[in-house]
Design a protein with these regions (language model features):
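Residue-level "contact hotspot" at macromolecular interaction interfaces
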Residues: 22, 39-40
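Short alpha-helix capping/helix-loop boundary micro-motifs
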Residues: 28-37
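A generic structural signal for residues embedded in beta-strands
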Residues: 23, 31, 48-49
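Short, flexible, surface-exposed loop segments at domain boundaries
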Residues: 1-10, 14, 40-78
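Short, basic/aromatic beta-hairpin or loop at an interaction surface
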Residues: 13-28
Length: 78
């Protein structure tokens, strides 16, 4: 299993199909909610993929479908 190289970088969401989002680097992610309300992504949203747990009201859990890793993503306003 190779280490994901996109940690700490800003990635634009280019496609969002329900809980599946595709980032501009081509990686596909499955979004699961950490809060009491659902987290939805739209094309054009920018996310930072992080291995930590940053404090942000729009934190969601995001799963890398290609590497079976559970990570934390912070939604950044474009």
């Amino acid at each position: 299993m190779t280490e994901y190289k996109g940690f700490g970088k800003r990635w634009k969401v280019i496609r969002a199909d329900g809980e599946i989002v595709t980032l501009e680097d081509g990686s596909k992610w499955q979004v699961s909610d950490l809060m009491d309300r659902p987290v939805e992504f739209d094309p054009g949203d920018v996310v930072i993929i992080s291995q930590g747990a940053p404090v942000n009201p729009k934190i969601c859990k995001i799963n890398n479908l290609t590497q079976n890793r559970e990570l934390t993503a912070v939604l950044v306003q474009p």
